[in-house]
């Protein structure tokens, strides 16, 4: 049975001190509640060690926001999957639309990043999704299929079952546009069918597919009620405990 998961992606926000305080505040709030999902926060690299040493990672699981596509070496500014894993971190976001758009990460580069993550026992939260031009042209299914096939389908079934997927329609992030629950469910069904075609029904059914397009306290419940939406990848709304809790409690 697949898990319900809510992931907070802090992006490039919060100083170290602010981040440690926020993580601890979230942990304390969750201790007082019975929630029906796993809660993960993916924080800046600079915060990982301090937060790992501060919180109970059985209550709030911890992830990074990226890892390098190389093992080690002369790659100034990069952080390897092995370095992240050595902290004790369990998860890493890969393929986020901002990494694709601003840093030129291609499907082939991302395949290498996923490979590095899996080899170091990190669980990839792998992002896929189309931009507005592709949605308007009706090409969203083609784009998403290509992202999945080129980045992920060289992995064995045993490796693939460790991966979490997150659909983020780029056109619905910070644009004032929103994907309807029907549009979201349609895409999640399509994604699951791609997995069925390649890995079979069992693995498709156990793969968590999250939604990452401006999911907030106001729309989380109507999104999460869809049978193929297994949670959310949350950006700005994860930076305030009360707001983030409202999304977590939408399950």
UniProtKB/Swiss-Prot annotation:
Pfam family, any one: TIM
EC number: 5.3.1.1
Active site (record annotation): 96, 168
Gene Ontology molecular function, alphabetical: triose-phosphate isomerase activity
InterPro entries: Aldolase_TIM, TIM_sf, TrioseP_Isoase_bac/euk, Triosephosphate_isomerase, Triosephosphate_isomerase_AS
GO biological process: gluconeogenesis; glyceraldehyde-3-phosphate biosynthetic process; glycerol catabolic process; glycolytic process
Keyword Hydrolase: no
Keywords: Cytoplasm, Gluconeogenesis, Glycolysis, Isomerase
Function: Involved in the gluconeogenesis. Catalyzes stereospecifically the conversion of dihydroxyacetone phosphate (DHAP) to D-glyceraldehyde-3-phosphate (G3P).
Quaternary organization: Homodimer.
Protein name per the record: Triosephosphate isomerase
Organism: Azobacteroides pseudotrichonymphae genomovar. CFP2
Organism ancestry: Bacteria, Pseudomonadati, Bacteroidota, Bacteroidia, Bacteroidales
């Amino acid at each position: 049975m697949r898990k319900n998961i809510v992931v907070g992606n802090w992006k490039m926000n919060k100083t170290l001190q602010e981040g440690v305080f926020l993580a601890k505040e979230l942990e304390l709030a969750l201790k007082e509640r019975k929630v029906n999902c796993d809660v993960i926060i993916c924080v800046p690299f600079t915060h990982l060690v301090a937060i790992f040493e501060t919180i109970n990672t059985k209550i709030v699981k911890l992830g990074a926001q990226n890892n390098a596509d190389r093992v080690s070496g002369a790659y100034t500014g990069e952080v390897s999957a092995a370095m992240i894993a050595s902290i004790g971190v369990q998860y890493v976001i890969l393929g986020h639309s901002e990494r694709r758009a601003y840093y030129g990460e291609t499907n082939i580069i991302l395949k290498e990043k996923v490979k590095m993550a899996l080899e170091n026992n990190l669980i990839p939260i792998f992002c896929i999704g189309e931009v507005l031009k592709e949605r308007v042209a009706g090409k969203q299914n083609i784009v998403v299929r290509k992202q999945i096939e080129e980045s992920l389908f060289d992995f064995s079934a045993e490796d693939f079952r460790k991966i979490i997927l997150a659909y983020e329609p780029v056109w619905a992030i910070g644009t004032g546009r929103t994907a309807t629950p029907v549009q979201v469910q349609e895409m999640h069904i399509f994604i699951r069918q791609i997995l069925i075609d390649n890995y079979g029904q069992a693995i498709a059914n156990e793969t968590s597919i999250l939604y990452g397009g401006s999911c907030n306290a106001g729309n989380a419940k109507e999104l999460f009620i869809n049978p193929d939406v297994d949670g959310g990848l949350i950006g700005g709304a994860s930076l305030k405990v009360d707001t983030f809790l409202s999304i977590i409690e939408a399950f």
